[in-house]
Design a protein with these regions (language model features):
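N-terminal accessory segments
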Residues: 1-34, 40, 59-67
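N-terminal glycine-rich flavin-associated loop
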Residues: 12, 35-67, 85, 89-121
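Short glycine-biased active-site loop of nucleotidyltransferases that positions the nucleotide triphosphate
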Residues: 34-36, 76-81
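Short clusters of hydrophobic/aromatic residues that line enzyme substrate/ligand-binding pockets
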Residues: 20, 29-30, 76, 96-99
Length: 121
């Protein structure tokens, strides 16, 4: 990684309420999913709230890098691996937000696991 982007990632880390990892171990853990593909990401973010997501989007836009959304990493086609910042929402974005029985809809955060939703219903 370039020294400048490393400094910028450290600065970003101080503004997030969630977690941001750029160490080799975390990057290697998130370099693959259930597919055969492997790409070492720039960093791994575990945002805690919507503001963290906004800060990550602003950072990616400013530094011309991608954000790769991820939850369980069960993709068989490599959608959640890449050279940008992996954004893992499975730790903090796990709330069921709304159940509308008349419309038969449920609004959830992206980290909600299907089995947990089924148990809740």
């Amino acid at each position: 990684m370039q020294n400048e982007i490393v400094k910028e990632l450290k600065a970003l880390r101080t503004t997030l309420e969630g977690d941001l990892h750029s160490d080799d171990l975390m990057r290697k853990l998130y370099a693959t999913d259930a597919s055969v593909y492997r790409k070492l990401p720039l960093a791994v973010a575990l945002p805690k709230n919507n503001n963290d997501i906004k800060l990550l989007i602003d950072f990616a836009k400013t530094h011309h890098t991608s954000l790769i959304p991820r939850t369980a990493g069960t993709s068989l086609a490599g959608q959640c691996v890449g050279e940008g910042i992996v954004v893992d929402v499975s730790k903090y974005f796990t709330r069921i937000l709304d159940i509308n029985e008349s419309d038969k809809t449920v609004t959830v955060q992206p980290g909600v696991v299907r089995d947990e939703l089924n148990n809740y219903l």
